[in-house]
């Protein structure tokens, strides 16, 4: 169940990013205006929404998620939407760590609902949203073992397998189709 939820979130990110890049480029074909106008809108949004909680890579959300801090139910979605908007404007970099933050915060939201340990489910989200968005299976499992330790390698593999199965061959990082 968790792997499917994280897989859907990863697919949502990859799909929305592809769609938003096309839409923003068609609305603002001049890249200079796109960055200028988009930056003004983005800055206002980031300041209005919890005074910068969603700025940067999202390491603050990761730390709060796995460390038992306060995570709000929409943290993952707001981080996802703001990251998609930022990247669609033409800003480069910052895809991987925000995916970790989106997954970890979604995991921190889902864990109490399912009666599961928050750090474990945040870790599952951390790797599964990334894996689904990038159409990778093994690398996220190894990342989970490296970052969170080997004790939960089996849950990492199970969650990642389900996230990978519903990927629909979308891939955030590459434009060539999956060899599957």
Predicted regions and their residues:
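Proline/glycine-anchored alpha-helix kink/cap motifs
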Residues: 97-99, 131-142
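Loop-to-transmembrane alpha-helix initiation sites
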Residues: 119, 149-159
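Helix-loop-helix hairpins and the membrane-proximal interhelical loops
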Residues: 19-108
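Membrane-spanning helices that line or support transport/gating and their immediate boundary helices
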Residues: 15-23, 140, 161, 165
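Conserved small/polar residues in nucleotide/adenosyl-binding loops
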Residues: 174-179
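Alpha-helical transmembrane segments of multi-pass membrane proteins
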Residues: 76-81, 116-129, 141
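A conserved active-site cap/scaffold subdomain adjacent to cofactor or substrate pockets
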Residues: 6-13, 17
């Amino acid at each position: 169940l968790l792997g499917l939820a994280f897989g859907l979130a990863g697919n949502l990110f990859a799909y929305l990013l592809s769609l938003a890049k096309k839409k923003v480029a068609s609305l603002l074909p001049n890249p200079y205006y796109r960055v200028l106008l988009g930056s003004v809108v983005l800055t206002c949004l980031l300041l209005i929404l919890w005074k910068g909680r969603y700025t940067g890579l999202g390491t603050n959300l990761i730390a709060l998620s796995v460390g038992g801090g306060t995570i709000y139910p929409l943290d993952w979605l707001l981080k996802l939407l703001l990251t998609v908007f930022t990247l669609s404007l033409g800003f480069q970099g910052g895809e991987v760590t925000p995916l970790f933050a989106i997954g970890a915060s979604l995991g921190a939201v889902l864990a109490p609902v399912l009666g599961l340990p928050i750090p474990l489910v945040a870790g599952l989200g951390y790797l599964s949203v990334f894996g689904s968005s990038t159409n990778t299976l093994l690398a996220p499992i190894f990342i989970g073992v490296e970052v969170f330790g080997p004790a939960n390698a089996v849950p990492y593999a199970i969650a990642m397998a389900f996230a990978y199965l519903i990927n629909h061959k979308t891939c955030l990082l590459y434009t060539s189709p999956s060899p599957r």
